[in-house]
């Protein structure tokens, strides 16, 4: 099981839907979050993409030197990037980071934003373009280890003599991750990607998506790994966790929800449609209505696009829910919480010891790394918990 965190390059706050409790997103703050994730033992961080975010490649590059082991899941965007340029970017980043790049293939689902970026393709055409893009990208990188060039002629993209002189550290190329809920997305995942990601839907729905992608891949003689994107709200007691969830949306007003849902409704993203359906397009507001599956809460999606659900509960409960998802075949969990710095620590301290995961040792010196807690009465270190042994 691999646990990832998230860099909030589109903003961070104690509350959703308001500037109250917000904090500036600058390099120093992102370095704090990345450094914490690196030290705490998270496998890597997802860096979001889109016009609401800072550029993910610039952000990721600025954090290479501030981290030692942390991996970076960074987006390539068919239609915005050319595949040969994206291949060079990926190879350079992988080389400079010592093999710490993961690539997130993002097709896009907001027609208005895409047209602003010069992409005038419908849903089906975007997936055709994405399939051509990632095929060219993969071939250029794979052939770079032997110095070969690549030719390709497609409906949307063509290259002649495409060649990369500096190969990536990872062979044949940095792993490709990808998320999408439509049939076209599942077909692309089955044919070309290494890891398929889903947003946090109820386990039964996630199981159906996994089965569909897995079956499609098997027919092509391939296997695909699986991951999930979730928020987490964990506190020492169940009541405290639900209180924190309610507090997170306590500043959200009706006008903000209506405006957000109208924006989501114009998108042609199947994943976004499924997220909105979990709270009936913003109509559901109470805890009972928003708890769509045990401890799975859809309140985040009232105003946040993309991943809109959170696991809410005490450490044992949240760990148990994660293990339930893992039993479906998921082994990659991309998590986040508000604010992202504090919650990175909280989740690692409270939940990591309860998960069936290989601990990531980030600090040299073995026993010097702790955790110990403050020395008692200037005499002894506190007793070590059984879960820490």
UniProtKB/Swiss-Prot annotation:
What InterPro entries is this protein classified in? Alkanesulphonate_mOase_FMN-dep, Luciferase-like_dom, Luciferase-like_sf, SsuD_RutA_monooxygenase
Entry's EC annotation: 1.14.14.5
One of its Pfam families is: Bac_luciferase
Q: Which GO terms describe its molecular function?
A: alkanesulfonate monooxygenase activity
What keywords sit in the KW lines? Flavoprotein, FMN, Monooxygenase, Oxidoreductase
| SUPFAM superfamilies xref list | Bacterial luciferase-like (SSF51679)
Q: Which GO terms describe its biological process?
A: alkanesulfonate catabolic process
**What reaction does this enzyme carry out catalytically?**
an alkanesulfonate + FMNH2 + O2 = an aldehyde + FMN + sulfite + H2O + 2 H(+)
Q: Which domain of life is it from?
A: Bacteria
Which HAMAP family does this UniProt record tie to the protein?
A: Alkanesulf_monooxygen
Stated role = Catalyzes the desulfonation of aliphatic sulfonates.
**Recorded family membership:** Belongs to the SsuD family.
Protein name per UniProt = Alkanesulfonate monooxygenase
Q: Which organism is it from?
A: Variovorax paradoxus (strain S110)
